[in-house]
Amino acid sequence: MIALGGLSSGRGCGSILKFVSWWGSFLATDGEKNSFNIVAIGLVLRGAPREKMDRNRFQKIVFQMTPVQKFLIAPDKFKGSLSARAAAEAMAAGILRVHPDADLDICPIADGGEGFMETLAPGLDARWITCAAVDALGRPIESRYLLAETPQGLTAILEMAETAGLWRITANERNPAQTTTRGTGMQMVHAAQNDGVVRIILGLGGSATHDGGAGMAAALGHLFITENGVNDDPRASNLGEIRAIDFGHRVDLPEIIAACDVDNPLLGARGATAVFSGQKGASVLDQPFLENALAHLVAVSEGHSAADIPGAGAAGGLGFGLLHFAGASLVSGFDLLSSLLGLEARIAAADHILTGEGSLDYQSLSGKGPVGLARMAQTLGIPVTAFCGVTDDEARGSGLFHALHALTDSGLPLDRLIAEASPLLTDAVAKANFFKP
């Protein structure tokens, strides 16, 4: 610390000294090597013009003088602008701009919606399988899923958004009463027919559907009986016509694990209709019909216990359908992904963690990926800095993050934030302060 005594007094010097003390406390566990770093920083500051020694330059100098830092970069998608992998690459570019020698562990995360398979594929050394299916409106498509060898055996990994996701239909086509999960069921049948498959993991989220999983169940072989015969295309618009369900014709299935990041039941004030149907195109006037359709499905199938399970309302009630018609278990999408990717060990090996998503707000605090990651890191004592498109006071005040940076803080218009999300995210990371205050 003797070297710091040579710093001339004057405006701005106090903040620099405070900043050095922050870095000193950050390094204080590493003995003589850190004492050397503090002295070296002081020597640099002695010869540096104060007016040019801004925080970003100081951070770069510190990074260059200290042992290589290891960063775990693990964002979720920035919906509408960046996939999880694209967000991770933008963050990595920001770190490398300041610290070219940083050790980076890039690990995009997902909650079960769009990008679930893409996130898992590299870490599991999985292979892609294609199969015929239909989209949320019943139109033929070519879809794909993953096959991967895991400690539990050969596993098929699907995401319902691959067939029945909102991304596959236009805004004008959104009509939850006319959508189907049949394509998801077709994928499940195809996956189950692969030799040696012992389980199917299915990510829920990003759905355009609201059929309670009835379309999926019909594809699996369940018969939905009406006064006019068998309805092989059940949708919310015609669920009320069902008089009975024949459960005796379902195809054989391996273990089914459904991954989701919501804990909503199927019905009621927190159910699929009340919470999620609006984003799929339903108006307030449509909601009573949609709620009654799901309630009728529960009654005619005697599925009351399944309807109350947390997560039953996921993906327009597909959570319920998987529980009741496929014998699935529902698990946290983050917990499942964490297990498959060995996330806890990767967190423990990092000096600092970067995460984020498009909207990091009060809803995220219910357990979405970045928050689950931050909570795990908090128990291990690893600091987490989050970046997002937009945030709120609840997320900022959660105490989970070393710092939280929102792109909207820049004051730029929304269209530019979306169009230039990647370079703006890179700039935000490069300018961020990763020192402990």
PLM features: residue spans?
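Short linear/disordered segments characteristic of secreted peptide precursors
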Residues: S8, A48-E51
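N-terminal loops that bind phosphate or other acidic moieties
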Residues: T66-L204, A208-P437
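Polybasic, lysine-rich low-complexity intrinsically disordered segments
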Residues: K18, K33-N34, K52-N56, K60-I61
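Extreme N-terminal basic, low-complexity initiation segments
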Residues: I2-L7
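Short, low-complexity, charge-dense intrinsically disordered segments
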Residues: V20, D30-E32, G42, R46-P49
